[in-house]
C-alpha cells in the first residue's frame, strides 16, 4: 500500500476495474428486490457544471447504498439532446446542431465517467437519435388516431424578422430576444396533447405520492388549478349587437353576480371583431393587444387598458344593460375569452373600473365594511353575507351560490361547472432541431398519420440553421411526399415537437433501450417501473414532472405499463452557490470577475475583509453568494477540481457541505478540508496494513477502553444507516464517520486486540464511505484483506450489544451550573445516582452552608442539585 494518498492512480484503477467487470450492468432478476434510481438526464451543453456534479453524486450515493443493501439497482444515464441551444450554437458557429451535440456528448460522458458513477452505460439513450424518437412518433400516431392529440389554431408570439414562433420567455419588452423585432400575436395551426382530459386524475393522484416534497405537489395543484364555479350567459342586447345570442363567462364567485357592472372580452373575441367594424380607435387597440405577450404572468402585471365597444349585454337576473369593453387583461385562450366584471370584489376589475370611471357596486359585506373606497384592499375579495343583492341579500357564499345557480338554471342562463387553469399542451415548434411530427397533409385526405412501417420520419442531420424560420419548411426533399392513404402528392409536416416530449418518457425507455418492438418492452418496463428515487432541480417541479406524470398515464392506457405514477420518491436538490465579485463601471453596469482572479484578505476569524483583483491590486466589490452561473462568472469547473483533488474529494465535499435539498455554498477551504480528511483515512489504514494482518476480535475479552472504541464504531453504523437510509441526510452521515475517525486515530494499537478492533473500525469507515467516496473505498477494502470488491460487500449492521454501556458518565450541576462529573454503573437506580451525587466533593464544596431543596435526576445524562 503506497504511503501517500494518490487519488489519480486510485481512481483510474477503480474505474478500470468497474469497466472491465461490467460492475453496473444489470438485467431483470425475478425474485430479487429491485431499486431504480434516476437523476434527471443532462442537456449536452458542452461541459459539466457543479449543479450536474451535485445531482449525479446524490443519485450515485443512493444507488450504491441500495446495492449494498442487496438490491438489484438500475442507475442509467442518457442525453436530452434536442433543443434551442444547439440551434443557437449552430447559427453562431456555422456548424450543424447534430455535430455540435454529438461532440458535446462525447466530452461530457468522459467527464461523468471521471466522477466514478455506478451507471449502466449499456442503457444510454440519446433523444436526438432516430432509434429513440421513432417510438415517440409511434406513440404520437396512436394518440392522434384516438383524439388524445389534435390540431387546432393557437395564438403564438410571432417574430416577423426571424419568421418563427417564440416562447413567452423569449419575448423581452415586446421584442424578439434575438432579432429585436416587435412581436406579433398570430393564429397558426398547432398540435395539442389533450392533457386537460387527465386533469382530475393528475390532481387526485398527487395524494398517492407521499415520497414527494409537499412544496412540489402544491405547485402542481396550483398549476392544474381546479376551481368550481358557474358558467353564466349574458343575453345579447339585440338593439346594439344586431343579433340574438349570449355572452358566455365562467366565474368562481357567482355570489357576486349582482355586483357585475360591465363585461370585458379579449381582443380576439367575436364581439370585439364585430364592434371594431367602422371603429378605427377600437381596431387600433385590438391590434395593440394582439402585439402583446400571450403569457398569463405578463398579462397579470401589465397596465390594465381597455376600449368601450358601444355594444351591450343584459344582466341574466336583472335584465340591466351592461356595457361590453375590450380589455387587455382578458385572454382568449383562458376560460371563454370573456369575464363578468365585479369591480367591488376583484382587484383587476377594480383597477380597470377606477381608471375608466365605471360603476363599482359592493354586494358582499367584508371585514372592511359595506363600502369599497379606493385604494383597493385585499379584504374586498373576502366571502361574506350578501348586500345590495335583492332576494339573495343576507345569504352567505355557499347558500348564495346554490340560490343564484337555481335562478340561472330556471332561466336556462347558467349552470355549475368545474374549470381548470391547466391548458392543453401545445407541442408544435417551428424549429429544426427537434423530433419531426409524423403527419402528412393531403388535400384530399386531410391530416394523415405516417404509418408504422414508414417510421421513423428522420430529421436530416447535415443542416446548418440560419435562424430565419424552420429550415425544414425550405427543404422540398424533406416535405415533398405521397399521401399514405391515397398516394396523391402531399406535404410532410415541417414543425417539430416540444423537447419536453422527449423527457416525458425517457425514464421508461431505459428499462428496454434496445427493444425494437415498441416504445417499451412491457415485462421489462413493469419489472423496473415506477422509478424508486428520482432526483432533480425544483425548477422542474411543474412542467417536466407534470408532463412525465401525464405521459405515464398515456402509456398505462396504451397497455405499456401497469403503474399509475412514474416516480415513487422525489428529491429536489438545492442549488450550488458561490461568492461573486464585480466592479461598477461609470455607466452603472457591473463587470463580473471570476473568483479565481481575486485575492482576498481575511481577519483573524477568517472573515473576508477586502478583495482585490490579482492582476492590478485594486479593490473589487463583493457581491455576495449567488447560484453559479456564466453571467456572474462565479462558476467552478468541476474538471479542474477533479484534476487537482480527485473525484472522491469533490463527491465528499458535495455530500458533507449541506443536506441535499438545501443550497450548497462552494468553499475552496471546504474542498481542501475534505481532501485532508481522506488523507487521514488513508494514512491510518496505511499504517495499520503495514503492520501485517490482524487477528480476530475476542468480544468477550474487551477492556472498558476497547468497549468504548467499539461502541463508537457501532454508534456510527447505527446513525449513518439512519441518516442515509431513512432521512437522506448524507452530510450528517459523513459527520458520523469523521467522529469515528477521531476515535480510531486516538485508539491504542499496542495489543493484538487493539489491532483487531482497529481493523473493524477501518472496515466500518470504508463501508460507510463506500457510496460517497467509492474509489478510495475500493482500494482500502482490498488492502484491508478482502477478495470481493467493496461494491459487493453488504452495508454494515450495528451490533446492539456493542451499544450497551456498563457505566455512564453523568454531568453534575448545582443550581444549573456545571460542577463536575460522576461515573455510575448503567444499571444504577435513581436513588443510587442521587446518593453518589450528594457526596461528590464538588457538590459538597458548592453547597456548603446551603440547604439542598431538590435533586433532579435525568437518567443517563445529568443530576441537578437545587440548593439555597
Swiss-Prot record:
Assigned EC number: 6.1.1.4
Chief subcellular location: cytoplasm
Motif window: 'KMSKS' region: 627-631
Motif ('HIGH' region): 42-52
Pfam families with a match to the protein in the record: Anticodon_1, tRNA-synt_1, tRNA-synt_1_2, tRNA-synt_1g
Keywords attached to this entry: Aminoacyl-tRNA synthetase, ATP-binding, Cytoplasm, Ligase, Nucleotide-binding, Protein biosynthesis
Subcellular location: Cytoplasm
Annotated coiled-coil segments of the chain: none
GO cellular component: cytosol
Name of the protein described by the UniProt record: Leucine--tRNA ligase
Organism lineage: Bacteria, Pseudomonadati, Pseudomonadota, Gammaproteobacteria, Pseudomonadales
Family: Belongs to the class-I aminoacyl-tRNA synthetase family.
GO biological process terms, semicolon-separated: leucyl-tRNA aminoacylation
Amino acid at each position: 500500500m503506497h504511503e501517500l494518498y494518490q487519488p489519480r492512480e486510485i481512481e483510474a484503477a477503480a474505474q478500470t476495474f468497474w469497466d472491465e467487470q461490467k460492475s453496473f450492468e444489470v438485467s431483470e432478476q425475478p425474485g430479487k428486490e429491485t431499486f431504480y434510481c434516476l437523476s434527471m438526464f443532462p442537456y449536452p451543453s458542452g461541459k459539466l457544471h457543479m449543479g450536474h456534479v451535485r445531482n449525479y453524486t446524490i443519485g450515485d450515493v443512493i444507488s450504491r447504498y441500495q446495492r449494498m443493501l442487496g438490491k438489484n439497482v438500475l442507475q442509467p444515464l442518457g442525453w436530452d439532446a434536442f433543443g434551442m441551444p444547439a440551434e443557437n450554437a449552430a447559427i453562431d458557429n456555422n456548424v450543424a446542431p447534430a455535430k455540435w451535440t454529438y461532440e458535446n456528448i462525447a466530452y461530457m460522458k468522459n467527464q461523468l465517467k471521471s466522477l466514478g458513477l455506478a451507471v449502466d452505460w449499456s442503457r444510454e439513450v440519446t433523444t436526438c437519435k432516430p432509434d429513440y424518437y421513432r417510438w415517440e412518433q409511434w406513440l404520437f400516431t396512436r394518440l392522434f388516431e384516438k383524439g388524445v392529440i389534435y390540431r387546432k389554431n393557437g395564438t403564438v408570439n410571432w417574430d416577423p424578422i426571424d419568421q418563427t414562433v417564440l416562447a413567452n420567455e423569449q419575448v423581452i419588452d415586446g421584442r424578439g430576444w434575438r432579432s429585436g423585432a416587435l412581436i406579433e400575436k398570430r393564429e397558426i395551426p398547432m398540435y395539442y396533447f389533450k392533457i386537460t382530459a387527465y386533469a382530475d386524475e393528475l390532481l387526485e393522484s398527487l395524494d398517492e405520492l407521499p415520497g414527494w416534497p409537499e412544496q412540489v405537489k402544491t405547485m402542481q395543484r396550483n398549476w392544474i388549478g381546479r376551481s368550481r364555479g358557474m358558467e353564466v350567459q349574458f343575453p345579447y342586447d339585440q338593439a346594439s349587437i344586431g343579433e340574438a345570442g349570449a355572452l358566455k363567462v365562467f366565474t368562481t364567485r357567482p355570489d357576486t353576480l349582482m355586483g357585475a357592472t360591465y363585461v370585458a372580452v379579449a381582443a380576439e373575441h367575436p364581439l370585439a371583431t364585430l364592434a371594431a367594424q367602422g371603429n378605427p380607435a377600437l381596431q387600433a387597440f385590438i391590434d395593440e393587444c394582439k402585439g402583446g405577450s400571450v403569457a398569463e404572468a405578463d398579462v397579470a402585471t401589465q397596465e390594465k387598458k381597455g376600449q368601450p365597444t358601444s355594444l351591450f349585454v343584459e344582466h341574466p337576473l336583472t335584465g340591466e344593460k351592461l356595457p361590453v369593453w375590450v380589455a387587455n387583461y382578458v385572454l382568449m385562450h383562458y376560460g371563454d375569452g370573456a369575464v363578468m366584471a365585479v369591480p367591488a370584489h376583484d382587484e383587476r376589475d377594480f383597477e380597470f373600473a377606477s381608471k375608466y370611471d365605471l360603476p363599482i357596486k359592493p354586494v358582499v359585506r367584508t371585514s372592511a365594511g359595506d363600502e369599497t373606497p379606493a385604494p383597493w384592499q385585499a379584504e374586498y375579495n373576502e366571502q361574506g353575507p350578501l348586500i345590495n343583492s335583492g332576494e339573495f341579500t343576507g345569504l352567505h357564499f355557499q347558500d348564495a351560490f346554490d340560490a343564484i345557480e337555481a335562478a340561472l338554471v330556471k332561466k336556462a342562463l347558467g349552470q355549475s361547472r368545474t374549470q381548470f387553469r391547466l391548458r392543453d399542451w401545445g407541442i408544435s415548434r417551428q424549429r429544426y432541431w427537434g423530433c419531426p411530427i409524423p403527419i402528412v397533409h393531403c388535400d384530399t385526405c386531410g391530416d394523415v398519420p405516417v404509418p408504422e412501417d414508414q417510421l421513423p420520419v428522420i430529421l436530416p442531420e447535415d443542416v446548418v440553421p440560419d435562424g430565419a424560420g424552420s429550415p425544414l419548411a425550405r427543404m422540398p426533399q424533406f416535405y415533398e411526399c405521397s399521401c399514405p392513404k391515397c398516394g396523391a402528392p402531399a406535404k410532410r409536416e415541417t414543425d417539430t415537437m416540444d423537447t419536453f416530449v422527449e423527457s416525458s418518457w425517457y425514464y421508461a425507455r431505459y428499462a428496454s433501450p434496445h427493444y425494437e418492438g415498441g416504445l417499451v418492452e412491457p415485462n421489462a418496463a413493469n419489472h423496473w417501473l415506477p422509478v424508486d428515487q428520482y432526483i432533480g432541480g425544483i425548477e422542474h417541479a411543474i412542467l417536466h414532472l407534470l408532463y412525465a406524470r401525464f405521459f405515464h398515464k398515456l402509456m398505462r392506457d396504451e397497455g405499456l405499463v401497469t403503474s399509475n405514477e412514474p416516480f415513487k420518491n422525489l428529491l429536489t436538490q438545492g442549488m450550488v452557490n458561490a461568492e461573486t465579485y464585480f466592479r461598477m463601471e461609470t455607466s452603472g453596469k457591473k463587470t463580473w470577475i471570476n473568483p479565481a482572479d481575486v485575492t482576498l484578505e481575511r481577519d483573524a476569524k477568517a472573515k473576508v475583509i477586502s478583495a482585490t483583483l490579482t492582476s492590478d491590486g485594486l479593490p473589487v466589490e463583493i457581491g455576495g453568494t449567488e447560484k453559479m452561473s456564466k453571467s456572474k462568472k462565479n462558476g467552478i469547473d468541476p474538471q479542474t477540481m477533479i484534476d487537482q483533488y480527485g473525484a472522491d474529494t469533490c463527491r465528499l465535499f458535495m455530500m458533507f457541505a449541506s443536506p441535499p435539498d438545501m443550497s450548497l455554498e462552494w468553499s475552496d477551504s471546504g474542498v481542501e478540508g475534505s481532501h485532508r480528511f481522506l488523507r487521514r483515512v488513508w494514512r491510518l489504514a496505511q499504517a495499520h496494513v503495514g503492520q501485517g494482518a490482524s487477528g480476530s476480535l475476542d468480544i468477550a475479552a474487551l477492556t472498558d477502553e476497547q468497549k468504548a472504541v467499539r461502541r463508537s464504531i457501532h454508534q456510527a453504523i447505527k446513525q449513518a444507516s439512519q441518516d442515509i437510509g431513512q432521512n437522506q441526510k448524507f452530510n450528517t452521515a459523513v459527520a458520523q464517520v469523521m467522529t469515528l475517525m477521531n476515535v480510531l486515530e486516538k485508539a491504542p494499537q499496542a495489543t493484538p486486540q487493539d489491532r483487531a478492533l482497529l481493523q473493524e473500525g477501518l472496515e466500518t469507515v470504508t463501508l460507510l464511505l463506500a457510496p460517497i467516496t467509492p474509489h478510495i473505498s475500493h482500494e482500502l477494502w482490498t488492502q484491508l484483506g478482502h477478495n470481493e470488491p467493496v461494491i459487493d460487500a453488504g452495508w454494515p449492521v450495528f451490533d446492539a450489544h456493542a451499544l450497551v454501556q456498563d457505566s455512564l458518565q453523568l454531568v453534575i450541576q448545582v443550581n444549573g451550573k456545571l460542577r463536575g462529573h460522576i461515573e455510575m454503573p448503567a444499571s444504577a437506580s435513581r436513588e443510587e445516582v442521587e446518593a453518589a451525587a450528594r457526596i461528590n466533593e464538588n457538590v459538597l464544596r458548592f453547597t456548603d452552608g446551603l440547604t439542598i431543596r431538590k435533586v433532579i435526576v435525568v437518567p443517563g445524562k445529568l443530576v441537578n442539585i437545587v440548593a439555597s
